[in-house]
Amino acid sequence: MQIADLITILGNPLTVMTLLPILGAMLLMLAHWMANAEMRVTLEKPIRAVNLTLALLMFILATLIGLEETFGLAWGEYLYQNCQVGEIGTGSCALIGSIGVSWHVGIDALSYPMVWLTTLLIPITMVVEWDAKKGAYFHSLILMMEGALIGVFVSLDLFVFYVFWELTLIPMFFLILMWGGEDRRYAAQKFFIYTFAASVFMLAGILVMYFNNDASWIGNITGKSFDFVLMDTQTNFIASEGLRSVVFLLMLIGFATKLPSVPVHTWLPDAHVQAPTAGSMLLAGVMLKMGAYGFLRLGVTLFPDQVIEFQTLLLILGMVSLVYGAVVCLGQLNLKRMVAYSSVSHMGLIFLGIATLEPLGIAGAIFMMFAHGIISPLLFAVCGSFKHHYHTLEIDSMRGLAKHSPWMSGHMMVGWMGSLGLPLMAGFVAEVAVLIAFYMAFGWWVLLPAVTLIVTAAYYLWSMQRTIFEGGRDDHDHPIAKLPSTLHGESPRDITWHENTGMLILGVLAVVYGIYPDFFGMFEMMSDWASLLVEYRLYPAEVGP
């Protein structure tokens, strides 16, 4: 690597967004660790403030990147036409040149919504947990996770992609282990084992791709490269159709576990229930989307023939996840566990959208990733405040919440309505897009997912009625709220200003994207990406001269 190359790469905005949060978090944790006991107490608030400042700077930079006039980004000219993933942010230099590992980052209409969502959620989670007595390391781990997540979404070298993929496990593991619930050790270990084991399948697929691509012109000792763009420009770079199918299935296992999809979903409810509020918000908001993003980026883009071949398998996985998640939700008494299983159901809808092989369905799946990344963190923030103020997550233990906590009740209603797909909410746009595409592809079979979505509405409305509105009666037959015994004589309270701030932002965005899905150009760029994917990858033979 030349010094000039290093300077160029470090000046790249995507490199800054990836490395600065990681390095900043490590330095802040090191400073706290090296301080004496008295100084550590003094440093906690400044370190927390620096973490939030860095997170806000990353959000500002991500927003500027999204403004076409700022960097001259043309969403329609990427990947398939120019063999590049975006005009802004692409830059590479050799890291381990002898084996074809390079620092190659880029952004396009698939990765940008995920990058922007990540930079949005990180400061919100910090604000929601602003007064949490969890020490200086807590917010630094959240900041470190931001860099790792952005690294996953912008890395175009698959070796570096895998490194960042695994790096995301470390902060989340410690967030659950150190600040989780009573069974946090079990949940943290289960989360790590499941996701790490799944990533081994993905790594095996990456290595097969590495040894089957031709990069002899680079002149390294292997004549191979981990570069995604290079692989993408080589049609069927894996000669054997059978081997391509094997690699596709390896990728599917790895990404479906992360999504997660039934039957490899069992780590998720335990992780959500035991994780702290910030951990659940990031897990549902962004980490689950890594699975869908990776499948679209590597599985669908590089192996289009196999997507068509295994279309039925994708349909089964999506439909089973959608139905199973919805039905299991009906029997849940724990608020967090119910929201966790609803995530499994929504992730099934993403698979169904991809399985339609229609531009609208794929765009709807991507928008579902984005919409769920706003709505689900809102619900987990509500769960966290419910636990914080009422010391319980049991739905049956609380009735008439609106009487004592009107702000919490309002945010809970917005989250539930968005999740069940109420019109004028972001989730509705994604669901309608997927269902229309499903009808275009499979006709009246669309009734199966449509009926399941009605079940989704049922369990949310049922829980909302019991928790927010339904109460008991006093000795004089007057309606009263039923307070949980876990209050131990404490007075019920509404949410704090910082909790309210984070929830308001998410709730407003859920409504804004429901009314105008193309706000900040989001749905348009998703549709462009999906259209080009279908036109140039899935059905290239149908493209005219």
Report the location of each language-model feature.
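Transmembrane helix-loop-helix hairpins at membrane boundaries of multipass inner-membrane proteins
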Residues: 2-15, 27-128, 136-140, 220-225, ...
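Alpha-helical transmembrane segments and their helix-start/interface "positive-inside/aromatic belt" motifs
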Residues: 42-56, 186-198, 405-409, 496-506
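Alpha-helical transmembrane segments
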Residues: 51-60, 120, 143-144, 249-251, ...
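Hydrophobic alpha-helical membrane-insertion segments
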Residues: 53-70, 195-207, 505-519
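A generic, lipid-embedded transmembrane alpha helix
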Residues: 55-68, 145, 289-291, 416-420
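Hydrophobic transmembrane alpha-helices and their helix-loop junctions in integral membrane proteins
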Residues: 124-131, 147-159, 173-471
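Short phosphate-coordinating micro-motif centered on Lys-Gly-acidic
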Residues: 166
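Cytoplasmic/organellar membrane-interface segments at the starts of transmembrane helices
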Residues: 215, 405-407, 461-545
